[in-house]
C-alpha cells in the first residue's frame, strides 16, 4: 500500500517495508550489513551509501536532527564482556521514518513514477518487458521495472531466479 494508506499492523508490506518500523539507523560501513562492496567496489559502495543518507536528509522534516555517531573504542565497562565491532551509524530518527517515506513517495509520484499496489505479479518476461498480472489474467508492459519485492516476495524471487537460472551464492 502507499504510505498514506498503510495500516500499522502491516509491518512487512507496503512502501518502506519492514524498515519503516525500524529504529531509524543506517550503518555507514561496508564491513557489516551487506555485500554491496563485493559487487561495486569499496569506493562506489561508500558513494552509494552517502546517496542514501543524503536522500533521507532531503526528505526528513528536520534534517538538522540527523546525526552520525562514530565510536572509536568500546567503553571500558563493556570490553571484558563483549567483542563489539564498532562502525559509524547515521541516526535518522524512528519517529520520522513514515514522514520521510511519504515525502519520498510524493516526490517519486510527482516525477512520474507509477506505483501499482496490491497487484500480484506471477511472472516476468524480461525479454519482452512484460509482467503477468494475476487478477487481470494478462500481461502489462513496462519501460523500467524496479524489482523491489521485499520480504513478502521471497518465494516469488526464488521462482524468478530458478526460471531464469540466475546465479546465487552463499551469504
Residue ranges of predicted features:
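Conserved catalytic/binding loops enriched for acidic/polar residues
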Residues: 40, 44, 48-59
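Alpha/propeptide regions of enzymes that mature by internal proteolysis
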Residues: 59-60, 76
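Compact, glycine/acidic-enriched structural inserts
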Residues: 60-67
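Residues forming the flavin
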Residues: 1-33, 38, 67-171
Amino acid at each position: 500500500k502507499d504510505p498514506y494508506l498503510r495500516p500499522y499492523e502491516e509491518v512487512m508490506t507496503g512502501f518502506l517495508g519492514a524498515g519503516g518500523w525500524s529504529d531509524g539507523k543506517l550503518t555507514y560501513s561496508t564491513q557489516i550489513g551487506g555485500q554491496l562492496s563485493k559487487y561495486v567496489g569499496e569506493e562506489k559502495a561508500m558513494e552509494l551509501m552517502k546517496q542514501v543518507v543524503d536522500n533521507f536528509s532531503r526528505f526528513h522534516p528536520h534534517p538538522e536532527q540527523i546525526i552520525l555517531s562514530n565510536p572509536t573504542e568500546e567503553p571500558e565497562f563493556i570490553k571484558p564482556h563483549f567483542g563489539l565491532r564498532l562502525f559509524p551509524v547515521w541516526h535518522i530518527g524512528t519517529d520520522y521514518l513514515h514522514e520521510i517515506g511519504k515525502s519520498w513517495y510524493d516526490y517519486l509520484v510527482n516525477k512520474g513514477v507509477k506505483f501499482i499496489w496490491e497487484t500480484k505479479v506471477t511472472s516476468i518476461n524480461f525479454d519482452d518487458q512484460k509482467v503477468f498480472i494475476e487478477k487481470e489474467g494478462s500481461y502489462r508492459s513496462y519501460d523500467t521495472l524496479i524489482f523491489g519485492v521485499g520480504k513478502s516476495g521471497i518465494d516469488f524471487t526464488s521462482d524468478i531466479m530458478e526460471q531464469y537460472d540466475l546465479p546465487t551464492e552463499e551469504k
